[in-house]
Amino acid sequence: MKVLVIRFSSIGDIVLTSPVLRWLSTQKNAEVHYLTKQAYDSLVKHNPHVQKIYLLQDEIADTINELKEEGYDLVIDLHKNLRSKKVSKALNCEYITFNKLNIRKWLFVNFKINVLPKKHIIDRYAEALDVLGLDTADRSMEYHFPHQYAFDLTAYNLKPKHYICIVIGGTYTTKQIPESIILSLIKRLKQPIAMLGGGKQDEIKAQKISEQCGSQVINLVNKISLIDSAYVIQKSAGIITSDTGLMHIASAFDIPIHTLWGNTHPDFGMYAYRVHNTEINNYNVNLKCQPCSKLGSDLCPRAHFSCMLNQNVEQIVKNCESTDAAQ
């Protein structure tokens, strides 16, 4: 059985498809191919459950022509937009997708009417694949490193399980932990802090934080690769993050996760996920204006950004200390 799984982007969304790849490979003895964007192929190419990766080309027709030569038995569309639908239809084989719940999300964002099911997106993937008769009881996520991968933590004065990661960035400003909150957290935490992120704005923000915190902070923003960042997370004593791709990568590792929610909401079903929900803490300020966006924006629509600025720093630090003591 030859199967094409489609998910174009982004970091977290692709990591969230990892249980699907395992179910197909281990139970259906399927030859699993994956269609994604070039920027994200490193998230898939080291996965032993994926035999071949195709990259989305500028012209969708070129992508389709390339894929047609494979003769797929099944397409599983986990992106479900116009381009992925066009690819799926053109391949003329069995097709499975899932309900993105966009109307319900729209109601929640625009009218604060929450009729979303209390289900994680991985649970919805499992339901969509019921027709294949798969055993989906193991819904744990996976992140795979390259063969013979090595990263020297000591080069950055980091010792395994003796530091906490803080993710300072995010795709949108309203999903990011503000500088003032990060500084308050670092001031109260006793452990060394490994700062993670990417992009020019994250770099500027990280420099400002580093200048105020001294040697306690190890600034890794824009200094290491995504794979290296994943390794730093895996070896940490825990991670403090907002709704980011690195949050989902952390879900694949046995470490405490502390997620601060900004404009988005865990009820969208995209929170940090483990089968037994161990050591996952969500911090969501109860505001009438939240969520204000499904994805995020450059500015708070009400100009107060209280969803982040009103986070209970003392509670977050207390929870970090309790999980650290338990290790």
Where are the model-predicted features located?
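Catalytic machinery of carbohydrate-active enzymes
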Residues: 1-327
